[in-house]
């Protein structure tokens, strides 16, 4: 490192230390201010002596729930409950009471309150507001789909009673392909328009999902806490703070204003049990809010494997037979408690949370089903604390502020302590190497404490123009040790990322034209202390601290020609910094690679969409999108030459182009038919090998990647079945098709001898019934209805036909 580099690094360190000190002082002042505000609020509440209560109704007589009844000039306010009733506690005196609700004229009434008093209000419809509401009253998912970004938006409410997890729900979405291994709790690979794995980032309420802890993914997040899912394709908005190459998935949790309890229990094939509980209690007068959630899942995962080769002693040859998995148990426990203040004048939400997760999994196979484990296990444990603050009109009008801080203690233990080689019968022979690592016995501990800070500021200049600034810090340590393997060298590495995004949004011509332009800055700092296996990991070249800095940018635009036709296009030069698993390995089966470079891609989308109203109760919705992805320094998992383990490397570039489309037909709220299809042309862009020789796989299709796939969904719904109010019967059927594809490079060997994964046809069906206005619900589901043999990553078999049932109780009247 040059003296100039040393000087710049020293200046950077001094600046960073000053920034940290300043940040700590600001935080101290902020905490003191928040405590004072809370104290003042408590004092106001403690001095309240009288109660003002009553009801809010429309002039036609119907009750109005969620109307805001507030005291002008104070922070006092309450929302009406489902019966339209409200309660306010206050000191005796004269007040101006304000009653407001979308679609109705605001009421202002001057009243005198000397003792407990009942005051009822009747609201008059506002024709102008109602007309505007018809235009703007679309669901958030629909408005998002009509933005400048290419995005799938999925409302979870119609699917809340389903036994499906998020993987299954997202996997049916347009342009998405999810491939799972080993049943419940198995690893999975999600592809968005061809780019998959770590090229896709996951968020929950705009916060990286990794903050939840090791082992937490789409498959084990309970659906009853989720409102909707946003899937961004290729171009990701700067407000997410994502270094995503192929896209991002943002899970939006429920933000209910009502109190509720939501509990469910499900049981199914292969010894599967799943229980979820979530709830919320908010005291309207003080704004104190408590939100607990708990989730438990267990599965034996002992489904049948078909056509497995085993050694037959009598015939002295390998024969094919069907056998059950026997070392594939999965158990997960997740719990979270969130508490704080909501809906006050000084904050929309100030919430503190603590969460815990534990995931224990037996390992049955390696990367392919020819490698069988019989004793190896993996356990992940995490504990997280966090704080979140949100306020509209923060300090000035039209400035919305979101601040989030969290710290997560994550640990993973991989146990690999037997010198055995197993087969599918459960038999084993003694060997001179462990099952996973192929070296000595080990119990590998990896601790990765993670700190995340996010600040998002959104300023609306007016209804047509807004600016958003987003800052995201993630700082992770890598503390690894092995008390069993005496040759393993412990170390403590560190990896930090700063991502700053700035975006400008226009909404012109009464919403017909929408533009978004953005720029992102990616800064990373890697500190390497480990020195073992330096000839594999490159640690000798990266010892000490190294930094990188990259710029990304993009824009998107949408123009609505008519209700039946809108056009949108978006582009991003995206940058993805290596993830901790890629840089630091996983402590057992994946080696570190400290020489990894950030990957980049130029992503382009051009799409059409629209709504066609066929008749009074018939509607047709369509969407089609053409996309191009040109990725450089593409990070890909490859087999390491030494000891046969894996390692991530910048080994290739990838060129992808394709087209996708979706068509939806709705008949009132009774029938919905949805069909989508995707075609990918994903090819290697690497022309030459490292030694300069031509690469035989140049312009070959990428191996082990589906390139044609489609989904069809049929949903029938009947409300007030047999004239009984508050009931709902729902039937769903979905069909998935995956075209055959090569398991290995198509440029290797003769066509007839190549391994292929055959075309697959998968059917699922479900039935749910709810009564008492959705309070009680029961669901039944059959997956892989026709019991077909289904494959996924590297031809690993998935479960055959299986059955599941689920009971759910939802209470929001208390």
Predicted feature residues:
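Short acidic/polar hinge/loop motifs at secondary-structure boundaries
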Residues: 87-89, 207-234
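N-terminal periplasmic accessory domains that precede
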Residues: 117-122, 132, 166-169, 186-191, ...
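Extracytoplasmic beta-strand/coil segments of soluble accessory domains associated
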Residues: 167-208
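Membrane-embedded beta-barrel scaffold of Gram-negative outer-membrane proteins
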Residues: 560, 568-572, 599-657, 678, ...
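Gram-negative outer-membrane beta-barrel transporters
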Residues: 621, 625-630, 649-742
